[in-house]
Regions:
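N-terminal intrinsically disordered/low-complexity leader segments
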Residues: 1-25, 217-221
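Hydrophobic/aromatic residues within well-ordered alpha-helical segments
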Residues: 26, 69, 80, 109, ...
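Helix-turn-helix
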Residues: 29, 33, 37-71, 75
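Short, basic, alpha-helical segments at the C-terminal edge of helix-turn-helix-like DNA-binding modules
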Residues: 48, 77-84
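Helix-loop segments that flank and shape redox-cofactor active sites
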Residues: 50, 98, 129-135
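Hydrophobic alpha-helical connector segments
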Residues: 69-71, 75, 86-118, 175
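Amphipathic alpha-helical packing segments from all-alpha helical-bundle domains
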Residues: 114-128, 136-162, 172-176, 203, ...
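Hydrophobic/aromatic-rich alpha-helical bundle segments in the mid-to-C-terminal region
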Residues: 160-208, 216-221
Length: 221
């Protein structure tokens, strides 16, 4: 009599799609939780352990996924810079460089700055406050500032190459004007302190950058 052989069970199918969905969902929860705690308690007082406990994950998971607290802020800043629309703000900004009309470019950049400032500037201001005593925050703040300055340099170069800059305005001067007027500090002064609306802020940025960068007589539509 032949020995009985237990039937071989087929391997369980592993739903990798569901796993990715759950991981992405947890990723979103973690980032929302971190943003809430940073806004509520500040950068220094918010700990990885606090974010982990509120998000329902382990601190080890946060360190593995983001590298720590500064990594959370870096990812939050990256997302904030995408803006409100389905197309990331930086992509829309790059596309504006191809416009033949300098006024359209400046107006578009002014609108984009007003769009992303309420999302990213509070994070920058948190880092600025923490950077005085926190080397990690200072390092991240400097990293983000350098990246923004490079981007403004690229924008200024695009204006110059297209012949849009007013005579006598150098690429470096244009870069610094763009860098200043799209800064978190400008957002803090006018929207946070003076309670300007986003629309008013956008109009101000557009009018001011037009007056400083474009040929005299250029006006926004």
């Amino acid at each position: 009599m032949e020995p009985m052989v237990a039937p071989v069970k087929p391997p369980r199918s592993y739903d990798s799609t569901e796993r990715r969905r759950r991981a992405q969902q947890q990723h979103e929860i973690t980032l929302r939780t971190a943003r809430t705690l940073f806004d509520q308690d500040g950068y220094t007082a918010t700990t990885v352990d606090a974010v982990a406990a509120s998000a329902g994950v382990s601190a080890a998971t946060i360190y593995k996924s983001y590298g720590g607290k500064s990594g959370l802020v870096r990812e939050l800043c990256r997302r904030a810079l995408e803006g409100d629309g389905p197309t990331p703000a930086q992509t829309r900004s790059d596309a504006l460089r191809n416009s033949p009309d300098a006024r359209t470019i400046i107006e578009g950049w002014g609108n984009l700055a007003a769009e992303v400032s309420p999302r990213v500037s509070p994070l920058m201001l948190l880092l600025r406050a923490a950077a005085v005593n926190d080397p990690e925050a200072a390092t991240l703040l400097a990293e983000i500032d350098r990246a923004r300055l490079r981007r403004m340099s690229d924008n200024a170069r695009a204006l110059s190459d297209a012949g849009h800059l007013r005579k006598g305005v150098s690429v470096h001067e244009a870069r610094d004007v763009l860098w200043l007027y799209t800064s978190a500090e400008m957002y803090e002064l006018l929207i946070v302190r003076r309670r300007w609306t986003r629309a008013t802020f956008a109009s101000f940025l557009t009018a001011t950058m037009t007056a400083l960068l474009l040929p005299i007589g250029s006006t926004t539509r």
